[in-house]
Amino acid sequence: MDKNFKAINEPIIDFEPGSEHRKLLLEEIERQSSRQKDIPIIINGKEIRTGNTKPCTKPQDHGHILGHYHEAGPEEIQMAIDSSLEAWKTWSNTSLEERAKIFKKVADLIAGPYRYKINAAAMLDIGKSVFQAEVDASCELIDFLNFNIEFAYTMQNSFTPISPDGMKNELEFRPLEGFVFAIAPFNFFSIGGNLAISPAIVGNTVLWKPAPSAVYSAYYIMELYKEAGLPDGVINFIPGDGPSIGDQVLGHKELAGVHFT
């Protein structure tokens, strides 16, 4: 990918009455509303179902179940940590160009075929209006992805140490040693996604814990990673009980950082 890549803000679609965009979004809302999604834990690219499930409901109608998610327990959390540490060995040595290429594809998928899925999921799961979903779930997440790529290139290419005659000074940017724990909020789709994305773009591996009330919409982002070709184990998806997961993860000796808002 071009190291001179420059990001631009994603244009906002207004979904005006009678438009094709509005028609396709309404069809996707109906599709998601009429079925229940079975949401697994994702560790090292594999779907894990513990059988210990919690419902995903519409915030304005708790009787409308959008799906059920499987909760990660201590065994799954340890598996996710092990997966992250193993994936780090390769991902931390993958070039920025290759990492950027994958996440640019995620941005392009959201801007294209996934836009209606993402917006509908945010509206149903988090209670966003159509305008809020378009701005937050689609445009801002696309912008996070694109600008993170630009900023990563800027960071890598803009600092050249001065080397006097007879000396050589070098500056190396490298990932953290260990794994990053990303804790997503319940009400901000794009920030929730970016908490996992931004460390990964610069070579870190991530345990991503979505908010219990926003697992449904977060899972759509996980599906995007797979389609974009993100290697297994770079981002592990661990929905579950916050205090239990937090106690186990925060006490681990290989924890390199916590990313939350």
Predicted feature locations:
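C-terminal segments
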Residues: 1-27, 131-134, 139-158, 171, ...
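Hydrophobic face of amphipathic alpha-helices that form TPR/SEL1-like repeat modules
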Residues: 1-66
